[in-house]
Amino acid sequence: MKKNAKKGLRKGRGSRNTLKIEDIEAVFAERKPGAEGNFKFFSVLVPLVEKEDDLYLLYEVRAKNMERQPGEICFPGGELEPVETTEECALRETWEEIGIPQEQIRVITQLDTLYTYSNFAMYCYLGVIPEAALEHLQFSENEVDEVFLVAL
């Protein structure tokens, strides 16, 4: 025989409090969900280059002597400094790694943020680098072995 569900419902201990659903809704009304964890924060620039009416992505090959991820193909980027925004970080790292001044980079938009299993939060920015800037690239020898373009 089925039990009456309402009769079978018991109040938990301490259920005499006055907390209401409205109270909970008020607490969460302005809350923005975020990532849980102890993250290290990084930013990258996903650089587009318009060259001879074609569009390219610019990639780096990380220096083989790097402690982490040597020889990997990546975008310019690195760890966030405490005094900068994530966008400023992406632009600073592009300058440090391949010598393109931030004044020459036009940021189009922020892309999705990637949260990794190893507690990295990677902020990504899509930007445009003028073709003329490619003539003046200066690699950080400690970080970059080469750069190359891939047509889209």
Q: At which residue positions do the language-model features occur?
A:
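Unchanged
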Residues: 79-152
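Short secondary-structure boundary micro-motifs
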Residues: 29-33, 56-57, 62-63, 82, ...
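N-terminal strand-loop-strand
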Residues: 34-75
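Short N-terminal helix-initiation segments at or just after the protein's N-terminus
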Residues: 20, 63-72, 88-94
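A generic short-segment signal for beta-strand/edge and adjacent turn/coil regions
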Residues: 12-17, 26-30, 41-46, 75-78, ...
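Entry/capping segment at the start of metal-dependent catalytic domains
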Residues: 1-36
